[in-house]
Amino acid sequence: MTDLRAWRDLRRKRREREAMLLDLGALVYELHRLGRRAPELLQEKAVELGKVDQDVRALEDALDGR
């Protein structure tokens, strides 16, 4: 993978991670506002976010030469 492509992938993954964080936060707030609980859904979303975060960290490490 060329460095340029890796940087583009990193930028895309960072945006995806940020959007997922915002969505997760909004979901937590809405559940709280409605007085509802959905731990399984929150766990599922957190796992998905964790996978994207791992991708971001791996790309950052690769680009930093670690």
Language model: regions and residue ranges:
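Short, charge/polar-rich alpha-helical segments
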Residues: 1-16, 47
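Heptad-repeat coiled-coil alpha-helices
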Residues: 19, 26, 30-33, 37-40, ...
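Amphipathic alpha-helical coiled-coil segments
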Residues: 21, 48-66
